[in-house]
Amino acid sequence: QECKCHGTSGSCQFKTCWYVTPDFRAVSTLMRDKLQRAVFVNSRNKNSGAFHPRLNKKRLQRELVYFEKSPDFCEKDPRVDSLGTQGRVCNKTSQQMDNCASLCCGRGHNVLMQTRRERCNCRFHWCC
């Protein structure tokens, strides 16, 4: 919520407030945290969609829940349009999702070293 004061010489005789959308980074951080804490709910009756969680219902009101496990994206699976991760280039020093531990799924990885020669069109200028 943001507010603005109205009045003579900056006094706050009237105050107008309105709701604003939160910062995108704040929302995405919150969603990432909720996704990492998501609670698996085992549905006993899959036809009706009813479930009987073993966890506290108050806790579930503010958490993300899921009732199907995610597919294994490491392996190729045409049913979910997953090409798998085999053959992709990973970044050995990265802490992000492109790191070798995430992409290689425990299969190990090969190190590729390349040397390139390129013309840089550099010039030396004597200045002094």
Curated annotation (Swiss-Prot):
Q: Name one GO cellular component term.
A: extracellular space
- Lineage top rank: taxon: Eukaryota
Biological process GO terms, please?
A: canonical Wnt signaling pathway; cell fate commitment; neuron differentiation
Q: Which residues are glycosylated?
A: 91
Disulphide linkage map = 3-17, 5-12, 74-105, 90-100, 127-128
Family named by the database record: Belongs to the Wnt family.
Q: What is this protein called?
A: Protein Wnt-10
Give the lineage: Eukaryota, Metazoa, Chordata, Craniata, Vertebrata
Q: State which gene encodes it.
A: wnt10
